[in-house]
Amino acid sequence: MQIVIPMSGFGERFRRAGYSVPKPLIEIEDKPVIAHIIDMFPGESNFIFVCNQEHLNKPAYRMAAILKEYCSSGRIVGIPPHKLGPVYAVRQIEDMLDQTRPVIVNYCDFTCYWDWGHFKQFVRDVGCVGAIPAYQGFHPHSFGNTNYAYMRETGGWVQDIQEKQPYTSNRMQEYASSGTYYFATARIMSEAFRSAMEQDLNVGGEYYVSLAYRPLLANKQPVAVYPLQHFMQWGTPEDVAEYNMWSRAFRQLVATTVVKSQTMGTVIVPMAGLGQRFAAGGYSLTKPLIPVSGQPMVAQATHDLPPAEQHVFVLRSDMQGHREVTTELTRLYPKAIIKTTDQVTEGQACTALIGLDAIAEELGDVPGPITIGACDNGALYDLTAFRSLVGDPDVDVIVWGVRGYPNAIRHPKMYGWINAKAGVIRSISVKTPLDSPTSDPIVLGTFTFRRAEDLRRVVERLIDRDGRINGEFYIDSCINDAIALGMNCRLFEVDSYLCWGTPNDLLTFEYWQSCFHKWECHPYGLEKDARVSQNTIDFLKFRYRATCPALPALMK
């Protein structure tokens, strides 16, 4: 296979974001992006790298040396800087191609999990003049604002393709090109590229490979879709940051096994919400029992809270699966207090107060510190650092937070934001972002109070002043009351925030768990993850197994 990789663009977005090397040389998983692209084609040696000559000329980039390190047989061609797109770049090296042999043009800002051998067999069996690897359905990067090349298809055959905009309002249900483009011969590619430029098929002055299929489709030539299981998008600084966040989290899940021996204080887990989004999404189990890594969600969430002497869980009596949840919690935490409320509360702060009252009634004195945590998220953090903060007698309240969480950046009005300096919290802004959502910390929904009476005081003060946000009393808001009462409130930043609070949150976690488990470039594996229930590993391996697409339907 002849493989051409146009990499002559400027990468302005990365430059503006502070990156010091061109996009193909940015390191991800300990090697440059271009190395991941080369790895997509195991056993191949006929590569042509079409580079920006200015990049080749800059000694600090070492572009030619890096390309030779990862592909010694590759041919490196420098062309003058331009803004005409990848079709123009590839046309500069057309005379280097065997016009009778197949060719792939591959962009330089992504990778995917696929079977290269299967793809080659697929195009041979199908007999198409072109094929486009693409993804459809749930892929987390599609939640961003970037649009790609989208296709109309019938039975696996492309009917139309357009750049930078979907055909419908539900782009996840459309096939989007990954950035790999196959042509049965280089001659077919060259003629398609020439036609595309003659017809002025460009977007913003750039000629994209996707649009070169339009002349082929107009002539009723068969172009197939090749569905992909996992796709890693690194086209923008935001894409890279989000990918790295998930990669770090799953690396940390298998890096060390934390032995939580010393227990202290109380953990209260409010779980009196309705969980309507999961029910609407077709989940039959009530939210706390939905499996995460083979364990009930509430068990995974509680596992990530500090080891405690006493646990309190607050449930609604009319919660679907109330009996099953109670049975499971009793099995996991035999000494736990399970408090039932007969109605939906007015918010997390009120539910936490119910839990505090329950343990006070049971034990009299409430063991401190008291940590309130949600039933639908986990966190990876330095337990020693947390205990050091708890051990500081000057600290009254600890607010758990994290920076750079992608969903908060996309939807800043859905989160609480922490205004802190040198770890000391000045205020909490609930559902209203601060100056810089990309770097300001958000509230996880986990809080630690040194004394039970302080928790009670701030919640009662919040209720007295009717400090509702969107009709609910949030513990986020209580922190402002704590500050007003003179309490020393400190920020505790976690390493990774694992959110399962909505169906999309859970699907995103499972997407990356599935991808990293299979992908040899990542160290994660289900069998290495101590949070994965041992008796469900085989089930999860089967669920996450590699898939290869079937052949398309016969063309009519």
Q: For the regions a protein language model found, what residue spans apply to each?
A:
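Conserved core of the sugar-phosphate nucleotidyltransferase
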Residues: 113-200, 379-466, 545, 551-554
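Short glycine-enriched, charge-decorated loop/helix-capping segments at active-site entrances
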Residues: 19-25, 197-199, 283-289, 463-465
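Active-site glycine-centered loops adjacent to acidic/histidine catalytic or metal-binding residues
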Residues: 9, 109, 136, 236, ...
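A structural signal for short hydrophobic beta-strand segments in well-ordered beta-sheet cores
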Residues: 25, 150-153, 225, 289, ...
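A short acidic, often aromatic-flanked loop/helix-cap motif at beta-alpha or helix-coil junctions
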Residues: 81-86, 138-140, 231-234, 343-348, ...
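Alpha-helical elements of Rossmann-like donor-binding domains used by nucleotide-donor carbohydrate transfer enzymes
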Residues: 91-92, 118, 212, 242, ...
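Conserved alpha/beta core of the MobA/IspD/sugar-nucleotide pyrophosphorylase nucleotidyltransferase superfamily
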Residues: 3, 174-267, 440-555
